[in-house]
Amino acid sequence: MRILGIDPGIAIVGFGVVDKEGSQLRPVQYGSIQTEAGLPVPLRLKQIFEAMQSLLETYRPDEMSVEKLFFNKNVTTAFTVGQARGVIILAAELAGVPVYEYTPMQVKQAVTGYGGAEKKQIQEMTKLLLRLKEVPKPDDVADALGIAITHAQFRAFISISEGVKK
């Protein structure tokens, strides 16, 4: 199964493509989509949408996992990131790729085994689990890989619950 993990943002969208074969995880590609700060938000959203369409076409993931929004301070930032998240999810929907969402706590739990893990711990475990030489930069990229790992870990439970619903 191929998973596209996404850490949404307006300035930087981290992405990580991971293949899961049995219990093995293999990184395929990872990086970021970056938009220029001075550009109007609609143009930045268009750039993110088009880049997402390209990623989805190039890597053809079976499923996509996205981090749920969690902001407790800056409401303006939350709205803008929410807009970016919307075009990201729309691109996946148009490509016929199912989207799964995870909270930051779920990511911490899946990657490190501890829901209160620090960012550095998550990044180091991501590096270890994917057998990378170093932690990917910027942080958004490492976060996206962590989100893909989270979906790989939760996938077995999703399959069981989907079977129950049928």
Curated annotation (Swiss-Prot):
Q: Name one GO cellular component term.
A: cytoplasm
- Give the EC number(s) under which this enzyme is classified: 3.1.21.10
Name its co-factor(s): Mg(2+)
Q: Which GO terms describe its molecular function?
A: crossover junction DNA endonuclease activity; DNA binding; magnesium ion binding
Catalytic activity reads:
Endonucleolytic cleavage at a junction such as a reciprocal single-stranded crossover between two homologous DNA duplexes (Holliday junction)
Superkingdom in the source lineage: Bacteria
Family matches, as InterPro entries: RNaseH-like_sf, RNaseH_sf, X-over_junc_endoDNase_Mg_BS, X-over_junc_endoDNase_RuvC
Q: Which residues bind Mg(2+) 2?
A: 67
Q: Which SUPFAM superfamilies match?
A: Ribonuclease H-like
Q: Where in the cell is it found?
A: Cytoplasm
Record: active site? 7, 67, 140
Q: Which UniProt keywords apply?
A: Cytoplasm, DNA damage, DNA recombination, DNA repair, DNA-binding, Endonuclease, Hydrolase, Magnesium, Metal-binding, Nuclease
Q: Does the keyword Magnesium apply?
A: yes
Kindly provide the name given to this protein in its UniProt entry. Crossover junction endodeoxyribonuclease RuvC
Query: What organism, scientifically named, is this protein from?
Result: Brevibacillus brevis (strain 47 / JCM 6285 / NBRC 100599)
- Gene name of this polypeptide: ruvC
